[in-house]
Curated annotation (Swiss-Prot):
Annotated protein name in UniProt: ATP synthase subunit beta
Pfam families referenced in this protein's UniProt entry, alphabetically: ATP-synt_ab (PF00006), ATP-synt_ab_N (PF02874), ATP-synt_VA_C (PF22919)
Designated gene of the protein: atpD
Membrane topology: Peripheral membrane protein
Xref: SUPFAM superfamilies: C-terminal domain of alpha and beta subunits of F1 ATP synthase, N-terminal domain of alpha and beta subunits of F1 ATP synthase, P-loop containing nucleoside triphosphate hydrolases
Organism domain of life: Bacteria
Amino acid sequence: MSSLTGKVKGRARKIKGDADIRVNESTENVGLVIRVMTAVVDIKFPSGKVPKILNALESKEIYNGKKLVLEVSQHISDSIVRCIALDSTDGLSRNDEFIDTGAPISVPVGRATLGRVFDVLGNPIDNCGPLTKSDYSIKPIYSEVPKLTDQKVTTEILVTGIKVIDLLAPYLKGGKVGLFGGAGVGKTVLIMELIHNIAKAHKGVSVFAGVGERTREGNDLYHEMIESGVINLEEKDKSQAVLVYGQMNEPPGARLRVALSALTMAEYFRDVENQDVLFFVDNIFRFTQSGSEISALLGRIPSAVGYQPTLAAEMGAMQERITSTNRGSITSVQAIYVPADDLTDPAPATSFAHLDSTTVLSRQIAELGIYPAVDPLDSASQALSIDIVGEKHYEVSKEVQRILQTYKSLQDIIAILGMEELSEEDKLIVARARKIQRFLSQPFHVAEVFTGTPGVFVSLEDTVSSFKDIVEGKYDHLPEAAFYMVSNINEAVKKAELLQKEGK
C-alpha cells in the first residue's frame, strides 16, 4: 500500500510502508530492540539520543506484511525507552532496528477521508486503494483542548426520532451523550439506529470510532452506511462519514489510540471546514480497558478494581477535546459497556462527569421484551428543563416519570399481595404505567432484517402529544398490547381495533 504524504522540516526521505511517517536522512536516529513483552517493547538508542515521549518509532523490517509502529511511553534511562506497539509484535526479535520519526502518530485529515475506513495509523483498510487526492493533510493525533474563550454552549435539541430518548433524556446539539448498558442489552443496535436516524438527516459529517468492538459489527455498520447513502462508493467526496477502526482482535496500543485518531479527523471538519460534526464511539469502556492492559505491562501500580492510576487523566484528555467552538460543533454519542451491570464501576463512573445526557439500558426492561431497553428512571439529561424543551414537554415528561416511579414502588406490594389489595387510584396508575412502559418501545430500522417490522422515526411533536394523551387517561380503555411497538397514539388505536377483531 502506498504511503501517505506529510511535511517535515529539512531534507527528508520517505520510508516505504503503511505508516505515514517521514525521517530526516542526515540525523536518522536508530535504536535496537532489547526486550519484547507482548505489546510493550524496550528500545535502546545511542546515549543522550532518546526519542521524546509520544514520538512514533518505525521498524526497518517488515512484520506481517507491514512496518511496525511503536509509540514512546516511558524513558527508562538516558538511552532506553519503553514503547507501546500499535500492531502485533509477532516476529519481532532482539536487535531489530527502529527509527525515531521525530513526531507523534499522525493521520490524514480532510475531505479525501470521506467514505473511507482507516486503522489507528490512518492507513485505508477498505480495499479502495491509497488516498490519491491532494485535498488532505497530515495531523498529529494529540492536540490541545480548545480555549475556554473559543468554546460555545448551545441549547438546541437534537431530535433522534426515538420516543424514550426524545421525551425523557433529550440530546443537546454539540453535547456529549453516553449509552450505558451491560452485555447484550442493545447498545450497538441503539447507536446504529442513532447513526441511521441522525446521520442520514444530518447535512454535516459523521465520524465513527470503533474502539475494541466486534469486527462483524464494524463490517455491518459499513454496509449499512453504504445502503443508506451515507457512504457513496462511486463518488467518495459526496459521502458524509469517516470510519476509524481498532477492533477487539488488535493489540491494546491500537485500541487505546484509535479514538484519538478518529477525534483528530472530526476536529478538522469542526475547526477548518466550520462544520457541525457527529462523533460516534463504540465502545468507551474498551478505551479504558486497553489503557488498563498497557498500564499493567508498563509496570504501574493499579488503582481501584485493577484499573490504571491514570484513568481519570486519560479519559479527561480525550473527552475535553470533544466540544463545540465558535467555528463548529462536535456532538458525541458514546456507547459505554457497564461491567456486571454495575454503574459504580470506575470505568463507567469516570465517564459520567463528562456527559450532558445519559441513556441507561436495563436488563430488566430487555427481559420484558421492550426495546430499546432504555431505563426511563435511570436515564437523565441536562436538556430536560423548561427553558430548553418548553413547558408542555417538561410537564409531560415529569408526569410520565412520576407514574413509572409510583408503579416501581408498588411492585413489591403487587408481588406479595396482588393487584386486588391496591386502591382504585393505584390500580389506575399501574394500568397507565404498564401502557406507558410498552409505548416506550419502538421498532428500529436497523433491526428490521431480524424482526420483520419496519422501523419508524417519530417526530418530537408526535411523541409529546401521544404521551400527554396517555397520562391524561384519554386511552385508558385500550388494551396494553395495543401500545407495544407502535410509533404514535393513532397507530395504537388502529392496533387495538385489529386486536379486537382478532378476539384478543
